[in-house]
Amino acid sequence: MRMYLWLLAALCLGFLWSAAAPQQVAPQYLSPRWSRQLPGGRIEDSSPTLYDLDGDGKLEIIIGTTKNGASPVLAVLEDDGTIKWSVTLPDPVNSSPAVADISYPPDGIPEIIVSTGGDVTQQRGSVIAFNRNGVQLWRYDTTDAQGTGTPSGNWSSPTVGDLDGNGDMEIVFGSWDRNIYMLNHLGQYQWHYHVADTVWSTAALADLDRDGDLEIIIGTDIAGGGVLPDGYRPTDGGFVLILDKNGQKLARRQMNEVIYSSPAVGDVDGDGRLEIFVGTGMYWYLQGRYTQPYVYGFRVNTSGSEWVLEDLPGWPQPVAYPGMSSPALADLDSDGDLEIIIGTGYAGSSEPNQCPPHCYGALYAWHHNGSPVSGFPMWPKDYMGKNAFIRSSPTVADVDGDGQLEILFSMNWDVLVVGPNGQQEDILHTTYSLFASPAIGDLDNDGKTDVVIGGSNYYDSSRGYVYAFTFGANSYNPALQPWPMFHRDPRHTGYYPQPPRLNVSPSSLYLLHQYGSGSAETAYLRLRNTGDGSFHWAVSSIPSGVTVVPSSGTAFYISTALLTVTVSTTGYETGTYSLGNAIITGASGGSPVQGSPASIPVTLYVGQVHRSYLPIILRSAR
């Protein structure tokens, strides 16, 4: 697409503001515990990934740099900021490295996968895998869609997952060469899906129909005037796409604006179905088509041959500004369902007396039904009291140990911390413009929350710098880290896992017994885990004369256990008998799972049982 000029403009605005040293004002702020210069260029849109690469119980920081000022590098830092290793790359990184064990069979040792070329003027695109010691394992180059003589660049971060459930990890990414790709664990091409325009969005992976295979959910650009390979005639805007494991289109929703945002997927309302959330971008907005920007919430209708992305009740929600931010999902108010959080804005900054109403960036949070969370939207202010655009995607965790979640994002030179009520809390101050998402964790396993972000330094702006901030003693709460890094996890799945959920069907049993014909009747129950993970289940109580086999077991994701229920009919005269309830419980980690206990009423009818047989006619196809 004619897609790069707006990015140049936005970057120039951001760095022009950075050209003057900040004048300190009065707000409370947190200084870095350490900062580290990297041997590569500035860090712009590469969000750090945290992972224990070497198994020492401490987290390493994995991040990439641009080519602005120095050669680009992929760097791994220890918890104290020591550079563990760095490798020089031929092309810049504006994506977030993914970390996963992609070996087949799995060996428990993680690898690092990074996409390159996401730069307006230096867009030689590749996806490269390294082992945990920085040795290159493979490299895959995209195609030259723009005719520059080099592969088109990749802004999209790689997403890693086992799409077909066979134990072999796949890598999915979008490219500026107008394709969505899937590679196998060896970096070998598996398929591509042509979208006829650039892809900036990072793919989410989720099993939308609970069949054991992962679907790919991703946003794209589109320019109208042509015909897609399947005959569809698009208009100017973008798409939200769902692809299956083989690269076949399951659903496509035409949008009136490009989609730079990376989708977030989760069961936000607790109904057992997954929802999809994504924001609209600003390419066409900057061309003078000032259509209303939105954040969308979708439910997937899988009943037809082609799935349909349907608007959720209360969605889409209008926002003041378009942008590049991707939504995060978290239970901000501890009510058991998930809220949707996103930043907005694309360029500029303003003084306090101009904002509101003349702001450039806002942070939004909604309940699952589209109603705003109390205190949102809010217009954050940085260290200098300025409001600015928010290109960063929010991350969410309890960073101060108070039992409540905070929202973190970068704006101007700072990482800002906002409470669940929309009140701005801490300001984590650096010395240069920040665009990426902060990562949250306990780097050195000392019980304190660490926040990591990449950027540069006003006095050394040709180099990349990594900053780490540390909160107080006992501030790290591992149970309250719902969205701690870009696209939630080191694989960048963008998926909020569902808790294990006990499901037993049918919900009641009605057994028919022909009087005088035997001593027992049999029926069946199907027990499933309709959530993620696993749980132990057991038949805790049954009526007299009733047996259930098996009586206990472990329910894994999408597994089904067939339970045989046998009712003794000895001693019953004709009539209908309510025998009582079979009680089945499920527990994980010592706590009941959702749907537990399941109570199944058992009813026995004894008398004359009549059977009717219906004819069926079969005709073979010729």
Listing of model-derived features with the role each one plays in the protein:
Residues 500-510, 528-566:
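Surface-exposed binding patches on compact interaction domains or structured appendages
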Residues 593-607:
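C-terminal edge beta-strand
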Residues 525, 573-591:
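A short beta-strand micro-motif common to beta-rich folds, especially ectodomain repeats
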Residues 22-500:
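Extracytoplasmic/lumenal domain signature
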Residues 499-530, 569, 604-607, 615:
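Beta-sheet-dominated interaction scaffolds and their linkers
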